[in-house]
Amino acid sequence: LTIVLILGASAVVAQEAAPARAQEVRVHVTSGGRAVTDLKMADFTVLEDGRALSVGALTSVQGGRVVFREGEGALPVSLDRSYTLLFQIMDWDPVLSEAVDHLFAAVLQPGDAVSLVTPFQAYHLQRDALAGRSKAELQKSMTDVLRKDILRGSGEYRGLVNELKRLTKSIGGSTTTFDEDLGTDPSMESSGGFGLEMQIDRYRQALMAMEGIRLVDEAKLLAFAGSLRPVPGQKTVIMFYQREYRPEISPATMNRLMSLYQDNPDILGNLMDLFQFYKREKTFDAGRVKKAFADAGIDFHFIFVEKKTQRVFGATMREQSEDTYPGFVEIAQATGGTAASSLNPSAAFKHAAAVSSDYYILSFRPGQVPGDGAFRTYDVRVARPGCKAVFPVGFYAR
């Protein structure tokens, strides 16, 4: 996954080197889909591991500004803002440029930091960039980079998908027109099923290569969270993840081949091996990652970009995102962020940016949390009817 390009530090090292945890929790409150910005300290109840906390102060932040503060125990509030946009996108969509337009036109302010991570590499916009260059210039530059890198970085992936389509159709025709399929590839021979073995082997290699490209590395996700933990202020991370489809040999074709070659143990063994690749195993522990993201104070928003499936004769187009989608949704929910599936990623981005801009910081009286390194959970409740509060699930006590 491309987010590995941002920083390579160990999450454990980052946590040990970070300053002591500020005793506070960031809370977003909505009602009917709109932010609620007029709550007071008395409207909130905060529990830690089921034990009520004494809230010492409340700070309301709207659009990067402190609107009001209440209570005498308020900790210093950093108004620094950093935005990280992650793109796991294989097909360029001009709608993505609308999201970048909105970022510069309606979200970013002087002093904000931006990181853009494409399928090819990461780019960082320093906090003073908006003061030295126009928003229009920066927006065009970022859009050009995004489009170029998506087209460039996804070339290998698209090539593998096309290879899988070709091989799937060819293997699917093995029971009837196999000799015709082999006629286009001089490296294969049809006698004794040798050509079929070669095609299955190539198909398996293409599957392995595709898995390597899309691998979500848990250690890198933890390191990413650890790298952001010492960063002060609001930390908004928005991931665009495009729905993926993979060409697979249809069950009917698989059964027909296994029946036809039941006396050929080599081909039967190769076909059985494919079932192992079709099994979708989780590639990262969402529970561990969501704790690291929550502890780092990250607002993580997950935008699942829908994509229409294609029909391929002789193949089954299998959804390939089911092993990662639930995990990222879980991380978003655990950090007080949002998760959305949409054919319009620009609209989903606007919603995520709006949600992240207005929040309350509830400060706790000092000395209530023993620094034993255990993960402690939060529960924040709002007394006003109809209000929904979202917040990080907890923190590592230090």
Question: Where are the predicted features?
Answer:
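Bacterial N-terminal signal peptides
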Residues: L1-S10
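Scaffold/interface architecture of coatomer-like assemblies
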Residues: A14-R398
